[in-house]
Amino acid sequence: MGRVFLTGEKANSILKRYPRANGFFEEIRQGNIERECKEEFCTFEEAREAFENNEKTKEFWSTYTKAQQGESNRGSDWFQFYLTFPLIFGLFIILLVIFLIWRCFLRNKTRRQTVTEGHIPFPQHLNIITPPPPPDEVFDSSGLSPGFLGYVVGRSDSVSTRLSNCDPPPTYEEATGQVNLQRSETEPHLDPPPEYEDIVNSNSASAIPMVPVVTTIK
């Protein structure tokens, strides 16, 4: 008897039916075993119960198993696609972000170079010439006007520039500004000397007449 009848656990393992996802529509539309087996997995025992004929059951089962193998192969192909497509898409997004960051850095660097080339630096060897101070300029605490201090600073800069160029030191006249005066005194006179008569006449004309002083004795 044990060979004919199965226990409850073994019978449930063989004749087990899984609940369908569209159980509500199954009550409205009564289906057949072929459609049910295509929509969900079924066993050989379920097919034999539906057909109640071994030949029809074997014919259906051979076509059903072949169809299941083909769908499993197509499913494995789609599984590889579903696995590789997100990886390729994520790699593309990472490369796009890196390219945009590199583009922004390159644009900022080009803009900085353009600004640097367009800026003309002020030459260091040129001195700034300040205008003369107004007559009503206020003197500082040392008693010297800022204009005089600027003149002294400019002359000291010129003297230091000469010394830096390995020129001989300036003379006293160059340092005090009496070069033009000395040159005017040492230049030869081109006019002829005056005559004696001209000197006498000029002296007599410029002489002050002397008024005699009269004294009275009492």
UniProtKB/Swiss-Prot annotation:
Annotated GO biological process: blood coagulation
Subcellular localization, as worded in the UniProt entry: Membrane
One of the Pfam families matching this protein, by short name: Gla
Keyword Transmembrane among UniProt keywords: yes
Keywords of this entry: Disulfide bond, Membrane, Transmembrane, Transmembrane helix
Region (Disordered): 161-195
Stated consequence of mutating residue 60 to I: In a breast cancer sample; somatic mutation
Cytoplasmic-side segments: 107-218
GO molecular function, one term: serine-type endopeptidase activity
Main location: membrane
Post-translational modification: Gla residues are produced after subsequent post-translational modifications of glutamate by a vitamin K-dependent gamma-carboxylase.
Protein name per the record: Transmembrane gamma-carboxyglutamic acid protein 1
Protein species of origin: Homo sapiens (Human)
